[in-house]
Amino acid sequence: MNLAIRGIACNLGEKAADTFHDDQHKDLKADFIMANPPFNQKAWRAENELTADPRWHGYDVPPTSNANYGWILNIVSKLSANGMAGFLLANGALSGDGTELNIRRQLLNNHLVEAIVILPRNMFYSTDISVTLWILAGNRKARTVEQNGELVKYRNRENEVLFIDLRQWGEPFEKKYIQFSKEQIAQIA
């Protein structure tokens, strides 16, 4: 609905469906992905469901108790070789143990995590918690690519992860919310 209101053309699939159980874009490989999946979604699959799902290939199966890492691996599975993804998750996704720790470790070993940005509380209408912006990149190796008719050189960033803690940043907005000023956005970028 949000996309339609804004006049943004998109392909959401042939029907309304549960992304995990009826993937409408099985073969999709995207250059850019932006997502705001439900935070800490409980009971998103039964214990014996989706255990051999190809989206988890090379990773542990995400726990049934919380879909955060199911969402992350769904996004990873959709990235093109040089794709970039940005998505929001609850901060707790940074510290889960067991299976979540193993998946997080494998994301790092696969050199996919470009940046982790912790945002201030009260930035969103739907929750007052601090959330984290994850940035993933499919190719972090040194390379030269043509963009808009110009050659752009990227240095090797495979063994680097940028961490930014912005929990103390922002300014009041509509009395109970926080937003970044234009100056702060320029400084962060």
Q: Where does each model-flagged region fall?
A:
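A conserved structural/catalytic subdomain of Rossmann-like adenosyl-cofactor enzymes
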Residues: 21-23, 27-189
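S-adenosyl-L-methionine
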Residues: 1-28
